[in-house]
UniProtKB/Swiss-Prot annotation:
Sequence positions that bind (6S)-NADPHX: G161, N214, V215, V216, E217, F218, Q219, R220, D285
Binding site for ATP: 256-260, 275-284
Entry EC no(s): 4.2.1.93
GO MF annotation terms: ATP binding; ATP-dependent NAD(P)H-hydrate dehydratase activity
Example GO biological process: metabolite repair
Record-linked InterPro entries: CARKD, Ribokinase-like
Protein name: ATP-dependent (S)-NAD(P)H-hydrate dehydratase
Entry similarity comment: Belongs to the NnrD/CARKD family.
């Protein structure tokens, strides 16, 4: 069994005091390199038994996330802060790709492209003139036409509103293969996860990919890999998430729930920010859009944690803060559009680096 790394600013699985050296705040500091918030837990035969509630520290993951956010500058040109693509959108589902794309823009992406079916394009265009919409997914030569656009985009979300039409799924499979060859970061959600469940080999070993399953999607993915998914406690859920990530060759898993679990191979962090008890549709689309943007930023930086792990953590944090703020204002009437309205406030208060030059 290999060593598993756990990160601060979250619930951390720790050994008992007899198995590690603890600092004055109760933080396990054994095997820490330069005390940068990376905790190495010595593996045990039994699952970890003790959860330690960590305090936010100077070198937390949130601090690491701030470092990758590009400073606003008069000297930059359009596109440098991020060009995000959303591959999804069908006749039945037009809101999901819109939520993902507009959320990426509200978090700081300069441009957002939506690649959807022809029947969805006019509707999505009507939601916002800020999105660039390509009605290409269901045309006969879709992959050839998309070849012009895919390399121009820094990161992609695959799945929001995609639908399960076989012809479209086959097109998306070809797109995925091309994105892997081009080494472009991708986030896969919703019907994109359905595609991966049918054929996990599509994504196996691609460590620039993040999968974002909810509880049901996690069960299906685990079944497809012949893994356990029935744990009822956080310890077991963490180990299951790590196991799925490793079974997929190190692909990052963001297991959504009351406590979000982000696992990148043997490295994992949990995020227990309080979100909203209002479970309106579209919150996962906001999450995936913001995560794709963070994934571009983290891969374009020299951050200490794995880029996909940091991107997953930052996006989960931002989404839950947005949900909480929106619920405080709107209560039972909270909708995803209310969460999107909170993105700027949450971003400014938690991710803007006050020392960055704004010139």
């Amino acid at each position: 069994m290999s060593t598993i790394l756990f990160y601060t600013r979250a619930l951390i699985i720790g050994a008992t005091k007899s198995q590690g050296v603890f600092g004055k705040t109760g933080t396990l500091v054994a095997n820490i390199s330069s005390n940068r918030g990376i905790i190495s837990i010595v593996p045990r035969t039994n699952p970890p038994q003790k959860l330690l509630k960590m305090q936010e520290e100077e070198n937390s993951l949130l601090e690491e996330a701030r470092k990758v956010v590009p400073a606003l500058s008069f000297g930059k040109h359009k596109g440098q802060a991020g060009r995000v693509g959303v591959i999804g959108g069908s006749e039945e589902y037009t809101g999901a790709p819109y939520f993902a794309a507009i959320s990426a823009m509200k978090a700081g992406a300069d441009l957002a492209h939506v690649f959807c079916s022809k029947s969805a394009s006019t509707v999505i265009k009507s939601y916002s003139p800020e999105l660039i919409v390509h009605p290409l997914l269901d045309v006969p030569n879709a992959v050839t036409l998309l070849d012009e656009w895919l390399p121009r985009i820094h990161s992609h979300v695959i799945g929001p509103g995609l639908g399960r039409v076989d012809a479209t799924l086959n097109t998306v499979k070809e797109i995925l293969i091309k994105l892997k060859k081009q080494e472009i970061p991708i986030v896969i959600d919703a019907d994109g996860l359905f595609l991966i469940t049918r054929d996990p080999s599509i994504i196996h070993g691609y460590t620039k990919a993040i999968l974002t399953p909810n509880v049901v999607e996690f069960q299906r993915l685990s079944k497809s890999m012949n893994l356990n998914w029935e744990s009822k406690d956080l310890n077991g859920s963490i180990m299951e998430t790590v196991a799925l990530s490793k079974a997929l060759g190190g692909v990052t898993i963001v297991r959504k729930g009351e406590v979000d679990i982000v696992a990148a191979g043997d490295e994992v962090v949990t995020m227990d920010e309080i979100g909203s008890p209002r479970r309106c549709g579209g919150q996962g689309d906001l999450l995936s859009g913001v995560m794709a943007l963070f994934s571009y930023w983290t891969h374009n930086s020299t951050c200490t944690p794995p880029p996909t792990l940091l991107a997953g953590y930052a996006a989960c944090f931002l989404t839950k803060r947005c949900a909480n703020q929106a619920f405080q204002k709107h209560g039972r009437s909270t909708a995803t559009t209310d969460l999107i309205s909170e993105i700027n406030s949450v971003f400014v208060n938690n991710f803007e680096n006050p020392t960055d030059p704004k010139s």
